[in-house]
Regions:
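Extended amphipathic coiled-coil helices
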Residues: 1-168
Length: 168
C-alpha cells in the first residue's frame, strides 16, 4: 500500500504571453535583479513579478521542488505540469534576453565613462583591460541570452531550482 500526498494548489488561469512578459520586464526589471547574477536574479524577478497577477494571485506554482515540477492552470481550468519550467522559459526568454542585454550595455557604458576620468598615461592600459572585461561581459551576456538553447542541460536545472526556491 503506497500513500500519495496530494498537494492542493489554487491558481488563477495562466494567461502569460511573450507580449505581457515584455511589458513586465520593461516596467519592473531593475539593476538589482540583474546584479544578483544569472539564474538567481532572473528567478527572483520571475517569482516577484511574472508568476503573479496584479492582485497578487499566483498563476504558476512549484508543485514538486525535488523533481522541478511546476504547475499552471490553462484556460479550460485544467492543471498542467511544466517540468523544469520549460513552458515558462519559452515565454519569458525573449524579454529576459533583451533586458539583460540592455543592462549589460548600460553597465559597460558606465564603466567606459568612469574609465575616461583617469589620466592619459594610464588610459591605454585601462582601455585594454576594459576591452578584455567587456569581451568577458559580452561572452557572459551571450551565454545568458542564449540560455534557451542551454536550458535543456544545466541552465534550466539552475533556473528551475532557483525558481522553486523562490515560489512558495
Amino acid at each position: 500500500h503506497q500513500t500519495k500526498n496530494k498537494q492542493i494548489i489554487n491558481l488563477a488561469p495562466f494567461d502569460l504571453t511573450q507580449d505581457k512578459a515584455k511589458i513586465i520586464f520593461a516596467n519592473k526589471y531593475t539593476p538589482e535583479y540583474f546584479l544578483q547574477g544569472g539564474m538567481k536574479g532572473l528567478a527572483r524577478f520571475v517569482s516577484d513579478h511574472i508568476v503573479k497577477t496584479d492582485t497578487g494571485e499566483s498563476i504558476y506554482a512549484c508543485y514538486d521542488r525535488s523533481r522541478d515540477v511546476f504547475k499552471y492552470k490553462n484556460e479550460a481550468g485544467e492543471y498542467i505540469n511544466d517540468i523544469k519550467a520549460v513552458r515558462l522559459v519559452e515565454i519569458i526568454h525573449p524579454a529576459a534576453a533583451e533586458h539583460s542585454r540592455a543592462m549589460n550595455d548600460k553597465f559597460h557604458e558606465e564603466y567606459m565613462s568612469a574609465l575616461s576620468e583617469y589620466d592619459e598615461e594610464n588610459i591605454t592600459n585601462k582601455i585594454t583591460q576594459n576591452e578584455l572585461d567587456c569581451k568577458e561581459m559580452k561572452a557572459t551576456q551571450s551565454r545568458e541570452s542564449n540560455f534557451l538553447h542551454k536550458y535543456l542541460n544545466t541552465e534550466l536545472d539552475s533556473f528551475s531550482k532557483e525558481l522553486g526556491n523562490n515560489i512558495k
